[in-house]
Amino acid sequence: MISDLKSSRGVDEPTIIVLKSRRIVVVFRGFNVISKNWNTRIRMGTPPHKWFTFSDDGGRTFSEPVPWRYENGEVFYSPASISRFFRSVVNGKAYWFGNITGPEAYGYSPRYPLVMAEVDEEKGFLKKETYTLVEDRDPETESEELQLSNFSLLEDRETGSIELYLTKLGAYREDRWRGDAYRYTIEVG
């Protein structure tokens, strides 16, 4: 549970990973939109976060959800968008893929850039020094409604590469539901 003063529609779309420390980490998307129809109590200017909770007792109990952060304690911002944990079979490292934005993100937007970062195996925070840009919006050719979210991940068992599949919805200014599909190959070695 999370207060509607922190996330106006609760939390949803969890991504879960078990760390090498045996800690279970769950990261959810939150929502910072004010809506009369939903009778929200959240305040204007509430920053957008991914929400973080963990269990050190095998999932019997979980901590109170808090804004997720880098391992140095710095909080980052993220819109209401799907994210994914992924553990590489090749190097055993845990990664997170998702959108990291500035504090101005509101609701679902913007859903760019798409980034990845390694997850600290002890506590479950992101290692800022591993932040890697996967894709970003081209302001010359792509709409501000671009969505670099709703992607799929798999690992090529022969090469060990991570393959990310993404349809760039909203890329075309004249048709927000039109989007081209892309495959990104990420070497993690």
Regions of interest found by a model, annotated:
Residues 1-189:
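Asp-box/BNR beta-propeller blade signature and adjacent active/binding-site loops
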